[in-house]
Amino acid sequence: MNHPFRILPLLWHARRPSRIHNMIAVADTFWLRKGYEALTFFGFILVHSRQEAERINNRMDTLKNHETIHLRQAQSCGDSWLRFYWKYMVFWWKARKARRKIRNAGYLLNPFEMEAYAHMNDLHYLDRQPDGCATGWKRYAQMSLDERLILLKQKRH
């Protein structure tokens, strides 16, 4: 998919986060920007190519785990994609204040991304969570922006 309106069928078929058990990867070069490997979009994983979509659809790996964590975060936001995306955008907007200190601050200091990156290599992380929900983002959301920045810098070194 490379046209902006081709995303409409995905929206039409969107289901509540709790009703999705296996996210399907779909190739979309329009909505997925350079520098990003994948994007969770209303229960689908958008990737750059059909080959990558097939690879993700056929096995669980760290990238699919990262995106599945976002699915479970949406479940923890009242089982609503709209609440999840609203909170995501608010966190992103607030974290932009640190953009002079770190590139892509809105993304990297977003509590949802911090939880997903912290646990993406642990393929059993979600299995250990109550009800399979990912709520670690709430701990990051309670931190100040400076505390999140310090934590991010510690993890990078």
Language model features with spans:
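General "foldedness" signal
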Residues: N58-R59, C77, Y85, P130
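Short, solvent-exposed loop/turn segments at secondary-structure junctions
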Residues: F30-W31, Q51-A53, I69, G78-D79, ...
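Metalloprotease/metallohydrolase-associated module, dominated by Zn2+-dependent proteases
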Residues: N2-Y36, T40, L82-H157
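Catalytic Zn2+-binding segment of zinc metalloproteases
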Residues: T68-K87
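Short pre-active-site segment immediately N-terminal to the catalytic Zn-binding motif
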Residues: E37-A38, I45-N65, Y107-L108
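Short charge-dense sequence patches
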Residues: L11-P17, L63-R72
